[in-house]
Curated annotation (Swiss-Prot):
The gene is sat. The keyword NADP does not apply. Belongs to the sulfate adenylyltransferase family. Keywords: ATP-binding, Nucleotide-binding, Nucleotidyltransferase, Transferase. It comes from Petrotoga mobilis (strain DSM 10674 / SJ95). It catalyses: sulfate + ATP + H(+) = adenosine 5'-phosphosulfate + diphosphate. It is an enzyme of class 2 (transferase). The keyword Nucleotide-binding applies. InterPro entries: ATP-Sase_PUA-like_dom, PUA-like_sf, Rossmann-like_a/b/a_fold, SO4_adenylyltransferase_pro, Sulfurylase_cat_dom, Sulphate_adenylyltransferase. This is Sulfate adenylyltransferase. Pathway: Sulfur metabolism; hydrogen sulfide biosynthesis; sulfite from sulfate: step 1/3. GO terms for biological process: hydrogen sulfide biosynthetic process; sulfate assimilation.
Length: 384
C-alpha cells in the first residue's frame, strides 16, 4: 500500500476519554464559532485526509506554501489550509491557549485549537499566488476576501464528527479506504474526481485508466461548490446508476470526497492528488482544466504543474488525458491521440454544455451521456 503523504497517516480524533476531559473543562476555555467550511477542514485534518497537516497552518508554512508550494520542511503542499477570524476575535485569544471551536449554527463543541500563532492573512498576495488572479468574480477569490483577516495557527484535537445528513454509506476516512482497497487485493488504484454528473468523456477516461490498474475509486466532491453546479444528491444518483449498469462491480468503488471546492485550477490539482494518495490511491486522473473555472487557467495547466516536482515528491502518478470527444466517423469516444478525423466530426462534451441543454429542457443525446443519467438530470431540471 502506498505511504500517506509525509509518511504517516495523521489521526487527530480524540479518544472517548480525551473528549470527556476536554468537554469537562470546556467552560474554562475561550471559544470561537466557525462556519461549516471550517468544520469540514477541521475534520479532514483530523481524519488524515490532509496528512501531513496536524492543524491549521502557522505563518512559516503559510509563507512557504505561497512561495514554493511546499511546507516549511520541504514536503510538497500547494494550498493554504487556514483558519481565519476577524481581528477583534483574534485579539481576545492568547498564543499558547487551548481554544474551543464551536459550530456557529448550533454552538455545538467540535474541536480544540492548540493556538500556536496569530498572523495576518495576506489576501491579495494569496489570491494571486493560489488563484493566479485577484478578480472577485472568481469564486475562490471572492470567498477568500470574505474571510477574517487574522489567521490562527496550531494543531487541533477533534472532539465531535460532523453529523452529515446525506451519503452516510459513502463516507470513508483514509484508514477505511486503505483497509477496503487492501481487502479487495488492489495494489494499484486510480482515483477520479468530479463535481459533475458522469458524461461519456468521463466514462472513457475512467475505463481507459481501468485497463492499466486494479481498481477505480470514483470520488465525487460533495463539499462546498458553486451555486450553479448540479447538487451532490442528484450527481450521486447518477453515479450509482451508471456504475450499476456499465462498470464491472468488482473493480470500482464509490466514496464521496468531503472537501470544499476552491476552483484553484493547477494548485488544486496537486492538492487533490495528495488527498487521493492519503486515501491509498496510486494514480490520479487529471483531465482538461481540472478544478478550473471560467478562463482563469490554461486547458492543460493542471497537468503541466506536476512537471515542477520529482515524481517521488508527490508520490501519486498523474494520468494526464487530453480532451475526449465522440467522433461520428469512428463512432466511438476518442482523443486527438487516437482519432485522425477533423473537428467537424467531433462532438465535444462538457459538464457546462450538458447543464446548458438541461436548463433549456433539452435531453442530452447518447453521445453526451447515458440515457439513464439523462433521465435523472432531466427530472431534476424539470422540478427546479
Amino acid at each position: 500500500m502506498i505511504e500517506p503523504h509525509g509518511g504517516k497517516l495523521v489521526n487527530k480524533i480524540a479518544t472517548e476519554e480525551e473528549k470527556n476531559e476536554w468537554l469537562n473543562k470546556s467552560k474554562e476555555l475561550k471559544s470561537i464559532s466557525v462556519t461549516y467550511f471550517d468544520l469540514s477542514e477541521l475534520e479532514n485534518i483530523a481524519t488524515g485526509l490532509f496528512s501531513p497537516l496536524e492543524g491549521f497552518m502557522t505563518k512559516e508554512d503559510y509563507d512557504s506554501v505561497l512561495n514554493s508550494m511546499r511546507l516549511s520542511n520541504g514536503t510538497v503542499w500547494s494550498i493554504p489550509i487556514i483558519l481565519s477570524v476577524k481581528k477583534e476575535i483574534a485579539d481576545e485569544l492568547k498564543v499558547g491557549e487551548d481554544v474551543l471551536i464551536k459550530n456557529q449554527e448550533d454552538s455545538k463543541e467540535y474541536a480544540i485549537l492548540h493556538l500556536q500563532e496569530k498572523f495576518e492573512r495576506r489576501k491579495e498576495e494569496e489570491a494571486l499566488k493560489v488563484y493566479k488572479t485577484q478578480d472577485k468574480a472568481h469564486p475562490g477569490v471572492k470567498f477568500l476576501y470574505e474571510q477574517g483577516e487574522i489567521a490562527l495557527g496550531g494543531e487541533i484535537t477533534l472532539l465531535n464528527r460532523i453529523e452529515h445528513e446525506n451519503f452516510q454509506e459513502f463516507r470513508f476516512d483514509p484508514k477505511d479506504t486503505r483497509k477496503i482497497f487492501s481487502e479487495k487485493g488492489w495494489k494499484t488504484i486510480v482515483a477520479f474526481q468530479t463535481r459533475n454528473p458522469i458524461h461519456r468523456a468521463h466514462e472513457y477516461l475512467q475505463k481507459t485508466a481501468l485497463e492499466i490498474v486494479d481498481g477505480l475509486f470514483l470520488n465525487p466532491l460533495v463539499g462546498k461548490t458553486k451555486d450553479e453546479d448540479i447538487p451532490s444528491d442528484v450527481r450521486m444518483k447518477s453515479y450509482e446508476v451508471i456504475l450499476d449498469k456499465y462498470y464491472p462491480k468488482e473493480r470500482v468503488f464509490l466514496g464521496v470526497f468531503p472537501v470544499n471546492m476552491r476552483y484553484a485550477g493547477p494548485k488544486e490539482a496537486i492538492f487533490h492528488a495528495i488527498c487521493r494518495k492519503n486515501y491509498g490511491c496510486t494514480h490520479f486522473i487529471v483531465g482538461r482544466d481540472h478544478a478550473g473555472v471560467g478562463d482563469y487557467y490554461g486547458t492543460y495547466e493542471a497537468q503541466e504543474i506536476f512537471d515542477q516536482f520529482k515524481p517521488e515528491e508527490i508520490g501519486i502518478v498523474p494520468l494526464k488525458f487530453e480532451h475526449a470527444f465522440y467522433c461520428t466517423k469512428c463512432e466511438s469516444m476518442a482523443t486527438a491521440k487516437t482519432c485522425p478525423h477533423g473537428k467537424e466530426d467531433h462532438v465535444f462534451l462538457s459538464g457546462t454544455k450538458v447543464r446548458e441543454m438541461l436548463s433549456k429542457g433539452e435531453k442530452p443525446p447518447k453521445e453526451f451521456t447515458r440515457a439513464e443519467v439523462a433521465e435523472i438530470l432531466m427530472e431534476y431540471y424539470m422540478n427546479k
